[in-house]
Design a protein with these regions (language model features):
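N-terminal nucleotide-binding beta1-loop-alpha1 segment
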Residues: 1-20
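Catalytic cores of nucleotide-enabled group-transfer and carboxylate-activating enzymes in metabolic
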Residues: 5, 49, 90, 187-188, ...
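Structural signal for interior beta-strand "rungs" in well-ordered beta-sheet cores
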Residues: 257-337
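Conserved N-terminal catalytic core of the sugar/cofactor nucleotidyltransferase
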Residues: 2-6, 32-103, 109-113, 117-120, ...
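Conserved core of the sugar-phosphate nucleotidyltransferase
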Residues: 69, 110-196
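Conserved beta-strand segments of alpha/beta enzyme cores
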Residues: 25, 70-72, 152, 215-217, ...
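Short catalytic helix/loop segments, enriched in acidic residues and glycine
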Residues: 21-37
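Catalytic-core segments of class I nucleotidyltransferases/pyrophosphorylases
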Residues: 154-244, 249
């Protein structure tokens, strides 16, 4: 394998708190599977090949992303922890002499800028491993970053393994790592399941690296919202609100007027032209294309497949689908089909 940068994305887990039959990473955030955001962030950050570790609902996940030629699917039949998931990729990457990004498929709020900062830090520090950290007001549930008196990272302690003093630490591990590939697999194989859950933690590999004298650095580059991993319907809803804000902010910066952002919902796949005005209580769902200088709503619902030409006017209360699109735009009548 040529020297490049690859990513291992952990997407095999089952979340009992989601109470769902659908694989967790296929739950949608603003119209897209949460895993899709992670894949795109890796691509935009310059990652060449993606190794996605799957387990529960593996065939469903593969079908959702069929046609993505940069993805190699890696099976993890039993979920024995993050280090075990990484080791499932060893047969594909054992001869790779580059950098391996490791992150989770249930963290769709990761930004490309954060991944690039992580990569730059890894390069300038010439580290064996680099992790991005976040500082949270409420660090409950997250692994804590333990540093010495000089600020050097000593390790990561999972929440349930923390002492009372460690629980007070607010710097946490959102699970974004960059490793020198051969060191990653060497030390992941040394991890033992010496914890409450009897799992193989990738965080333990970092502690073993440090004890062996390898340089491990951490960069506080993660916004608090990026640290959210979705493990419940409540977190799914919270993540959707944050993603919706990002979608609308990007559109407004491109010249779209959104009169009342909190009362407007726009799908991540929608395309909206400059100088279009979106009135309150409008929902734009699915792959919708809206031209320049349009006015939509209020109280309009545009279904997937809708295409509006430049200057279109959608009257209040209009429901548009691909089937009634021409009539709705021409007459501005209310449609309920």
């Amino acid at each position: 394998m040529s020297k490049e940068r690859v990513a291992i994305i952990l997407a095999a887990g089952v979340s009992s708190r989601m109470n769902t039959k659908l694989p967790k990473v296929l739950h949608e955030v603003c119209g897209r599977a949460m895993l899709a955001y992670v894949l795109d962030a890796c691509r935009q950050a310059g990652v060449g090949s993606l190794y996605v570790v799957i387990g529960y609902g593996a065939e469903q996940v593969k079908k959702q992303f069929e046609g993505s030629k940069d993805i190699t699917w890696v099976d993890q039949p039993e979920q024995k922890g993050t280090a075990h998931a990484v080791l499932c990729c060893k047969k594909h990457l054992k001869d790779f002499d580059g950098e391996t990004l490791v992150l989770c498929g249930d963290g769709p709020l990761i930004r490309v800028a954060t991944l690039k900062t992580l990569m730059e830090k890894h390069k300038t520090e010439r580290s064996a491993a680099t992790l991005a950290t976040a500082v949270l007001d409420d660090p409950s549930g997250y692994g804590r970053i333990v540093r010495d008196t000089y600020g050097n990272i000593q390790g990561i302690v999972e929440h349930r393994e923390c002492t009372k003093e460690q629980l007070a630490i607010k710097e946490v591990n959102p699970s974004y790592y960059l490793f020198n590939n051969k060191i990653l697999f060497d030390f992941a194989s040394k991890v033992k399941p010496d914890n409450v859950k009897k799992e193989y933690y990738l965080t333990d590999a970092l502690s073993i690296m440090i004890a062996a004298g390898h340089k491990v650095t951490a960069v506080t580059a993660v916004l608090p919202e990026e640290a959210i991993s979705i493990n419940s319907r409540v977190q799914l809803s919270e993540t959707g609100k944050i993603m919706q804000r990002r979608i609308q902010l990007e559109l407004m910066n491109k010249g779209v007027t959104i009169v009342d952002p909190p009362n407007t919902w726009i799908d991540a796949r929608a395309q909206i032209g400059q100088d279009t005005v979106i009135e309150p209580f409008t929902c734009i769902h699915g792959e919708v294309k809206i031209g320049r200088g349009c006015r939509i709503g209020p109280l309009a619902y545009l279904r997937s497949g809708t295409i509006l030409k430049n200057g279109s006017y959608i009257k209040p209360g209009t429901v548009i689908s691909q089937e009634n699109m021409d009539e709705s735009v021409r007459k501005g009548k209310k449609n309920v089909s």
